Structures are given as C-alpha cells and as structure tokens.
UniProtKB/Swiss-Prot annotation:
<protein>
    <recommendedName>
        <fullName>UPF0231 protein in hemN 3'region</fullName>
    </recommendedName>
</protein>
<dbReference type="Pfam" id="PF06062">
    <property type="entry name" value="UPF0231"/>
</dbReference>
<comment type="similarity">
    <text>Belongs to the UPF0231 family.</text>
</comment>
<dbReference type="InterPro" id="IPR008249">
    <property type="entry name" value="UPF0231"/>
</dbReference>
C-alpha cells in the first residue's frame, strides 16, 4: 500500500494508491478532526495480533466509513455501500463504481500507514 500525506487549508490530507483509496477517505473523514481516536485502533491491532491464529473480529463504526478487523486483515468500507442499489436502473454498459468505497490491507501495512500519519502530523503540522 502506497500513501502520501500533504497539508491543505483544512489540515493534513491523506492519499492512497488505487485499491486502497478507502483507507485515505476513512482517515480524512474519521480521524483528522480527532487524532486521539487512533489510540483505541492501535490497541485493537495488538488484540488482533494476540488472538492469532484464532479467529477474531472487531468493528470501529464511523460517521462515513467503518473499519473491520480480523486477526490479519483490515477492511475500510463506506457506510453507505450497503444501501440498496438497483442494477436495473443503470443504463446498459454502465456499472457501479465502488473502488473508493471499500479497501483491504494486511494488519501490518495498516499499522505502518497509521504510524506514518502520526509521524507526519507530529513533524509537519
């Protein structure tokens, strides 16, 4: 997973590589206004590691995006993704685009992403 942090007039903005955009959107929507929310997420990462190889799941539900943890993977998913969507309403040849609404990565990669964000905020903000 590749990522980049920048400053804007709204504060720190995260961007992620394709297939991981939902993690940046989650961070920008749920964490940038309240970085103290990272502490319970780091604690959850440790619980996931401690549970390995047993099955373990946890959900952090946010306003716009939620995180789903298991013992080795994290999923960021837009809360509105499960909204009813009628394929019949779409014109022929079109399909629903949800690449920015859901993403998966390993637990270690997610932890590195969050630590890099923390470092950027502490160093440059």
């Amino acid at each position: 997973m590749e990522y980049q942090f920048t400053h804007s007039i709204h504060g720190v903005v995260a961007k992620c590589s394709m297939d991981h955009e939902a993690f940046a959107r989650w961070l920008n929507a749920e964490i940038t206004e309240n970085p103290s929310q990272l502490a319970p997420i780091f604690a959850e990462i440790e619980k996931c590691r401690a549970a390995f190889p047993n099955h373990y799941e946890c959900v952090f539900e946010g306003r716009e995006y939620s995180l789903y943890f298991d013992y080795d993977e994290v999923m960021a998913k837009a809360n509105n993704l499960d909204a009813a969507f009628d394929d019949e309403e779409m014109e022929e040849g079109f399909q629903f685009y949800n690449e920015e609404s859901i993403a998966f990565c390993g637990l270690d990669d997610f932890e590195k992403f969050l630590k890099a964000y923390q470092h950027f905020v502490q160093t440059y903000h």
